[in-house]
């Protein structure tokens, strides 16, 4: 369960972190601050939110996912995704800032720029995944609320 939830959170969080790191847009500082704020979200709060959303009387209650084994990964994914997004943005931003002008000057297309910068930051991304896995494997509170018992 920890492995699958950390993989899913890593994929979503890395995508969000890359989008924020690569793009300059109005309100970027607010988005980064919001991501970093969500990194400190208490696990029990996440468990309660997911439980309320998917319980029988919640907006997604008709899906009948609560207390199922497959649904147990939802709480850690919600908990870990902001952590991965924030750490990815923090790790990638300096590399983007230094390498992007050179890559643009050499005529690299946007697709190639992204893959070159990801390759340049592979060790940081490995560390981000290991942290996500450690967080997922140590998570008990949110999973117990969503899974029962």
Predicted features by range, described:
Residues 1, 52-83:
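Loop-to-helix entry region at the N-terminal start of transmembrane alpha-helices
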Residues 27-30, 67-70, 77, 81, ...:
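Alpha-helical membrane-protein architecture signal
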Residues 142-149:
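Glycine-rich helix-loop "coupling/hinge" segments at transmembrane-helix boundaries
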């Amino acid at each position: 369960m920890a492995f699958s939830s950390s993989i899913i959170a890593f994929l979503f969080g890395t995508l969000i972190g890359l989008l924020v790191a690569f793009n300059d847009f109005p309100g970027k500082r607010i988005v980064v601050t919001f991501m970093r704020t969500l990194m400190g979200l208490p696990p029990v709060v996440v468990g309660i939110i997911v439980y309320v959303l998917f319980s029988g009387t919640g907006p997604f209650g008709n899906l009948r996912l609560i207390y199922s084994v497959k649904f147990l990964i939802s709480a850690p994914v919600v908990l870990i995704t902001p952590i991965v997004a924030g750490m990815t943005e923090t790790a990638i931003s300096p590399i983007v800032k230094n390498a992007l002008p050179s890559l643009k000057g050499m005529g690299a297309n946007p697709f190639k720029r992204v893959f070159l910068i990801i390759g340049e930051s592979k060790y940081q991304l490995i560390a981000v995944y290991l942290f996500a896995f450690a967080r997922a494997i140590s998570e008990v509170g949110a999973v117990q609320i969503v899974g029962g018992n």
